[in-house]
Every structure is written in C-alpha cells, then in structure tokens.
C-alpha cells in the first residue's frame, strides 16, 4: 500500500512482463466524476439527518457513519488522482518527502474508509438485531447518546488501526491482518444474519406483526452488505495476489484490472445513498424537501 502514486506503473510493468493481459487504463475523468458524485450524495445524507430531528435516531446515526466511510473512499480517490496529476506535470519530486507524506495521508483515508465501512455495517447489523428481537426494550438499550458513544469508540479504533496499518504496510503480516479483517467481520455479520432470520421465522409464527414491522431494516442491511461485498471484494483479492503471487501470469492478469476494481469501490459510495432513499420513506422525504428548497432559493 505504500507509494501509491507509483502503483499504476508497477502494475503496468507486471502485467506486461508476466502475462498477456495489458493493464486496463480508465480515463481520469471517470474517477473524478464518480468520486465527486459519491461525495455529494453522501453529503446529502449527512445534511438530511442533521436538518431533520425526526431522523436523529441511533439507526440514522449509524447510517451516517457508513455515509462518512463512503465519503472518505471518494475523497481518497480525488486526492490520489490530483497527486498523480501533479506528479505527471513535474510538480512533485519522485519519492520526495512531500510525496511520501501525501502518500501516507491518502493511504490512511483509503484504509479508514474500508475499516469504517466494515465496522459501520457491523454496528448496523447489531442495531437491527436489537430492533427486531428486543423491540420493546430498544429505546432503553440503544439511546442516541449511547449510539454516539459507540460511534466515537468505533472511529477512534478505526483511526488508530488505519495509522498502524499504513505505518507497517510494507510488512507481510500487516497485509495479512488487513485482508483478514474483511472476511472476519463479514463472517460476524453473516452469523448474526443467520441467527436473526432463524429467530425471525419462529417469531413470525408466534407474533406475526412484531417482526414484520422491523424486518425492513434487516432487508436494507442485506442489500447494503451485498453491494459492499460486490464492490470491495475484488480489491481485497487484488491486495492478496499482489502480496503473495505478483509474478504469476494469472495473478498478473487479474491485477491488470486494478483501475476497474478502483471504480467499483467508488461506485459503492454512489449506490448506498440510493439504497437509503429507496428503503427509507423518511429519508426520501427529507431528500425531496432539500431539493425543493434549493430549487426555490
């Protein structure tokens, strides 16, 4: 993950020397456009929750946490492309102190985005579990203050972990730990899911109205999790292949799709707000009010 400004050249060289697959190069305009749209969409989510007291509940606080993670992923790509552009124009000294510092900052944003997304999805899963199976005690268990404390601890842990990963990113154990977080957290969420839906079936037989009223949030989380896996898994696989088999022709062929995998990550930031709006009538109404007010102003 170090020297991200030189990553494209390394991938091009690897793909050219070890396989018949040329590196897929996408126009920088695509990255800028997708990243800017992702930032604006998730900023709308944050503003909608901030401006509407009806949305200021633990569930939407956790959604805001996921939106912040998506924004960081988009900002990472914007900053990375700007730095690459400056380097190509000769404004950055190759491997100089400023480039090294900028590289660390950009890498930190990227890793923080991934860690924040995984942790936010885990917290949302736990919140949905409490909502469905402890509905009567939910407002006592999950207060807004408690939700904010959870998010503070979550982001403090993600920040510390992100800095540690960037600092020791040239060590293979760090790469293994980084990539292991992805399947471990997903395994936790999936286990919670299996338990959740098995209990939901039994609850449906006894009290049909109770789980049906709250299962919408679980379905929303299912969609969010599916999109997250689809968008991030190709990059995680890329990191593993780049670490353990960079000279293998088949690995090099897959790594030639690095920029495509990068666009997939950016698309995650664009898709998530549409999922929020489609699954949440309250958030959809807040979006409409914001758009109408801005148009009339």
UniProtKB/Swiss-Prot annotation:
Gene3D superfamilies: Rhodopsin 7-helix transmembrane proteins
Topological category with respect to the lipid bilayer: Multi-pass membrane protein
Cytoplasmic side: 50-58, 127-147, 200-217, 279-297
Compartments (UniProt record): Cell membrane
Listed GO biological process terms: adenylate cyclase-activating G protein-coupled receptor signaling pathway; regulation of metabolic process
Glycosylation-annotated residues: 12, 17
PANTHER family: G-PROTEIN COUPLED RECEPTOR
Name the record gives this protein: Adrenocorticotropic hormone receptor
Organism, scientific name: Bos taurus (Bovine)
């Amino acid at each position: 993950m170090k020297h991200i400004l030189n990553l494209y050249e390394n991938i091009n060289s690897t793909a050219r020397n070890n396989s018949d697959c040329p590196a897929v190069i996408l126009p920088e305009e695509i990255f800028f456009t997708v990243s800017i749209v992702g930032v604006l969409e998730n900023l709308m989510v944050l503003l909608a929750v901030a401006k509407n007291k009806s949305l200021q509940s633990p569930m939407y606080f956790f959604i805001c946490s996921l939106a912040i993670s998506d924004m960081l992923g988009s900002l990472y790509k914007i900053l990375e492309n700007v730095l690459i552009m400056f380097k190509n124009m000769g404004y950055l000294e190759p491997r100089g102190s400023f480039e090294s510092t900028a590289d660390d900052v950009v890498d930190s944003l990227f890793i923080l985005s991934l860690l924040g997304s995984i942790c936010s999805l885990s917290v949302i899963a736990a919140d949905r579990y409490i909502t469905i199976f402890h509905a009567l005690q939910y407002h006592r268990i999950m207060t807004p203050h408690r939700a904010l404390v959870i998010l503070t601890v979550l982001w403090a842990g993600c920040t510390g972990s992100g800095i540690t990963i960037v600092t020791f990113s040239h060590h293979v154990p760090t790469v293994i730990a980084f990539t292991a977080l992805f399947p471990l957290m997903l395994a936790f969420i999936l286990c919670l899911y299996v338990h959740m839906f098995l209990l939901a079936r039994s609850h449906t037989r006894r009290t049909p109205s109770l789980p049906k009223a709250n299962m919408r949030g679980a379905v929303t989380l299912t969609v969010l999790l599916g999109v997250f896996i689809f968008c991030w898994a190709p990059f995680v696989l890329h990191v593993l292949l780049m670490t353990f088999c960079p000279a293998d022709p088949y690995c090099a062929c897959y790594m030639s799709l690095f920029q495509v995998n990068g666009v997939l990550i950016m698309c995650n930031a664009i898709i998530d707000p549409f999922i929020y709006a489609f699954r949440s009538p309250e958030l959809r109404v807040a979006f409409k009010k914001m758009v109408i007010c801005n148009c009339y102003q």
